[in-house]
Each structure stands twice: as structure tokens, then as C-alpha cells.
């Protein structure tokens, strides 16, 4: 009778392992191996051995349940998880806070710009005053689009200056002769 009980226990274990699909079932199967020897460097025979081992694995695959790994973004599942975290209830009554309205101040334009009537006017540095002052022909800096050929003494025409100098020298020479 002890033999019968032991025989009964083994099928139960195999049934349990088969139902669970655990490692116990895989451990009971014998492992198949093949030795490959080649005389040409192992190129063609190693490839055929790889093909044979791949075919054997393909034959063993239908007996084992295959696990499919999902790769990608599950947008729908993420939105449902976030939706449970944030809930919006429509029709909920909350007391509305009354914002005190400020009376608009009506100021005249002069009052808006002349708020500091008591303060003294801003003091300008002398350099800024000098630049803003219209000196005329003796402008110290020649700047701007219309200041081409302008020197310290105004616009200068070298040809005219040369003619003036010649006339003055001729006049001086003519006066000395008389």
C-alpha cells in the first residue's frame, strides 16, 4: 500500500507543475545536445548546427506558453489613472468671494504728470548741456547724417579755402608792391 500512495503523489505533483507551468516541469525533461565537428573551419557546419538548434527550439515553442512583451505607450491606461486622482464636480456650490471694486480716480493730465510739484527739476551735467546747445559753425563734434565734411569751424571746402588763401596772398603781394 505504501507503493500505491507514492504512485498517487507523483502524478499529483506532475499535474500541479503542468498547471502552474513552473520550473519543476522543465527540470524533469532531458536536455538534448549535439556535438558538431568540422574539417573546413566550422563555417558551413556551424551554420547548419545553428539552423538545427533554431528548428529544435521552434519545435519546442508550441509546448511552452509564449510571453508577449508589450512595448510602447499606453495612453489610455495612463489617462484613466490620472482621471481618478483629479475629480471635478459640477454643480457644487461654493461661496463666491466679492472683490471690492475700487473707485476709479479721475485725474487730469496735468495732475498725473505733475505729482512732484515740490521737487526741483533734475540737474543736467555740463557735458550734456554742451552737446544739446546749438553752437552753430563751431560745433565740437561733427555727427549725424548731414555732417559730412564738417570740421570744428563748420563745413569746409578745400578748393574754396585754397582760392581764398591765394587771393589773400596775391592781395598782400600786390599791396606790398604799391
From Swiss-Prot:
N6-acetyllysine carried by residues: 64, 150, 152
N-acetylalanine: residues carrying this PTM: 2
Biased composition (Low complexity): 37-47
Keyword terms: Acetylation, Cell cycle, Nucleus, Phosphoprotein, Ubl conjugation
GO cellular component: nuclear body; nucleoplasm; nucleus
Principal subcellular localisation of the protein: nucleus
UniProt superkingdom: Eukaryota
InterPro entries for this protein: PCNP (IPR029169)
Location of region: Disordered: 1-82, 134-178
PTM entry text: Ubiquitinated; mediated by UHRF2 and leading to its subsequent proteasomal degradation.
Keyword flag Ion transport: no
Pfam families, A to Z: PCNP (PF15473)
Basic and acidic residues composition-biased segments: 1-15, 160-178
Modified residues (Phosphoserine): 53, 77, 87, 119, 147
Entry-linked PANTHER family: PEST PROTEOLYTIC SIGNAL-CONTAINING NUCLEAR PROTEIN
Name used for this protein in its record: PEST proteolytic signal-containing nuclear protein
Phylogenetic lineage: Eukaryota, Metazoa, Chordata, Craniata, Vertebrata
